[in-house]
Swiss-Prot record:
It is found in: Membrane. This is Glycoprotein gp100. It comes from Dictyostelium discoideum. The gene is gppA. Residues 1-19 form the signal peptide. Residues 511-544 are cytoplasmic. Residues 126-142, 150-165, 189-199 have a biased composition (Low complexity). Keywords: Glycoprotein, Membrane, Signal, Transmembrane, Transmembrane helix. Residues 20-489 are extracellular. The chain crosses the membrane at residues 490-510. Glycans are attached at residues 80, 224, 308, 332, 366, 380, 410, 422, 478. It is a single-pass type I membrane protein. Residues 84-215, 444-480 are annotated as: Disordered. N- and O-glycosylated. Residues 84-99 have a biased composition (Polar residues).
């Protein structure tokens, strides 16, 4: 009779717990938010946060109408739980142990792992002890008896450790737990429980992985998409077998991972990343106030043609693109033209009207060159002789004839300013603004004024921004102008005049010996030779 009453009592408890679990299972799913992580070209991860139940409901995930067969489910925590992360809010699912052996619910091991920790300590202690085994054996179902205490003790077992022995079903087992319940919570329960099921390798990482989302109390569903062409904006639905469902619209982010910039003369700009479009039309791209004409577009690359320009901070606007952001999640996208590159600077620091030659890339026609003295005085290289995107030649003003005083070693600055908005920008600002460049020029110390004058005549002090070897003085004299050029003109004129006289005499001599036709042919050939050997521009400049 006593056994019958005990069985009836246990039956009522089990039915009550089943009723509560079924009541919880009747709650409809709720999608709170949808996030995504771009790991392309490997995979694209979609994360659904909300309140879901995977047990006894047949949870189904659909994306764009297609069922997702492979997904990961992570159970969240109750917000008011202050204990260890293993404590989860629904330990009642453990009442139906047959459900846990079903392979379909293998993704719910995170909840199974959490339900093992709240189970009372008498179960692990009842196995090694010999005396209390007789009392649990009379209760017949050992798997059901541990589920009875979780319903009544799971809320109260967390604040204090003393109520755990008082909630045991039989008074005979109280002596053993009181002496053994203190050490087991730190030593025995975790190894015995983790070694019990074969699924423990799966739930062990789950309490730590959703730690950031678990703190918000949300359940997590994750699934991956490996083909970028399958990623579109659309509806994601979580549904149960009983017909309850929850849907939310998903819109992926287009991420610009890198930008291949063009030079100052204009060219092709290429955006690389993961791009998702609102429709089938090509995107419309605008950089600053300039339209970048679209050439090609795909889900991994966008190419457009941009006209000439320079500088940084141009806003990028791409229409027909879903949520364009950069790698850091910033939606304010900016573009910079390729920086001007100075390969070499050639000039003479002590000569009047010296020519400064700058060789590099990405120059503008309206670029200016400023030479700055150590005392802060600046001189413009104002007389521009040649200006292209790769070469800039200018003549230094007359007032700038000494960069450093004799017998001292100073470092002067040659600042190449590309499209400068303000010619009075300080050196510190110039170094920080994109599009501005400074070259440090080391000057050699002069021992005497005579040595300094010798340097002026021979051109030994050459400016070289990259520390390369100096150009030969003969080549330098050609660029500097002055007396050296006059000597060169004389050396060219005298041999040329002699050559013309000799050629004329030879022509007259040939005319007297050869026929008139052959003489005319020889005269034409001589005229061709003269036009090749005589530098016409040099002669023209001297005569004028």
């Amino acid at each position: 009779m006593k056994n019958f009453i005990l069985l009836v009592f246990l039956f009522l408890l089990v039915s009550n717990s089943l009723g509560k679990s079924n009541k919880k299972d009747d709650q409809s799913p709720e999608i709170v938010k949808i996030n995504s992580n771009d790991h392309l070209p490997l995979y694209y991860e979609i994360i659904i946060s909300g309140h879901f139940s995977i047990d006894k409901t047949g949870l189904t995930v659909t994306y764009l109408g297609d069922k997702i067969h492979d997904f990961e489910f992570i159970k969240g925590q109750v917000l008011n739980v202050t204990g260890e992360p293993q404590n989860n809010p629904i330990p009642t699912v453990s009442i139906n142990p047959d459900q846990l052996n079903d392979d379909r619910f293998e993704v719910s091991d995170s909840s199974d792992f959490s339900k093992q920790t709240p189970t009372p300590t008498p179960t692990p202690t009842s196995k090694p002890t010999s005396t209390p085994t007789s009392t649990p054996s009379q209760t017949i179902p050992p798997t059901v008896s541990p589920t009875v205490p979780p319903q009544t003790t799971s809320p109260t077992s967390k604040p204090t450790s003393t109520p755990t022995p008082t909630s045991t079903p039989t008074p005979t087992s109280t002596p053993t737990p009181t002496s053994q319940t203190i050490p087991p919570p730190t030593t025995t329960p975790k190894p015995t429980k983790s070694s019990k099921p074969t699924k423990t390798p799966v739930p062990t990482p789950t309490p730590t992985r959703p730690s950031s989302s678990v703190s918000k109390g949300y359940d997590i569903i994750k699934f991956n998409i490996t083909d970028i062409e399958d990623i579109e904006m659309g509806k994601i639905t979580i549904s149960y077998k009983n017909g309850q469902s929850s849907s939310k619209h998903f819109q992926p982010n287009s991420i610009i991972k890198s930008i291949e910039r063009t030079n100052s003369v204009g060219g092709v700009v290429e955006f690389k990343g993961s791009f998702f479009y609102t429709d089938d039309y090509e995107p419309s791209i605008k950089i600053g106030n300039k339209i970048c004409e679209t050439l090609t577009s795909s889900q991994t690359s966008i190419r457009c043609y941009l006209t000439n320009g320079t500088g940084c901070g141009y806003t990028i606007t791409i229409d027909n693109l879903l949520n364009p952001i950069d790698n850091n999640g910033n939606s304010n996208l900016t573009y910079c033209y390729a920086n001007p590159i100075i390969d070499k600077v050639i000039g003479y620091k002590d000569k009047k009207l010296t020519l400064i030659t700058i060789i590099g890339k990405n120059f503008l026609n309206n670029a200016t060159v400023i030479i700055e003295k150590p005392n802060g005085n600046k001189r413009n290289c104002s007389n521009v002789l040649l200006s292209t995107d790769t070469l800039f030649i200018c003549e230094l003003s007359k007032s700038y004839h000494t960069l450093s005083s004799p017998k001292t070693t100073n470092t002067t600055m040659l600042s190449f300013i590309n499209n400068s908005p303000n010619s009075t920008v300080s050196n510190e600002i110039i170094e920080m603004i994109s599009g501005y460049f400074q070259i440090k020029i080391s000057t050699k110390p002069s021992t005497t004024d005579d040595d300094n004058n010798k340097n002026n005549d021979d051109g030994d002090s050459e400016i070289d921004s990259v520390g390369k070897s100096a150009v030969d003085s003969s080549k330098s004299n050609n660029n500097s102008g002055g007396g050296g050029n006059k000597k060169l003109y004389l050396l060219i004129i005298l041999p040329t005049v002699l050559f013309i006289i000799v050629a004329a005499l030879v022509a007259i001599f040939i005319k007297t010996r050869v026929s008139q036709n052959s003489g005319s042919k020889v005269n034409k050939n001589n005229n061709k030779k003269d036009s090749i050997n005589v530098p016409f521009q040099m002669l023209d400049e001297i005569t004028t």
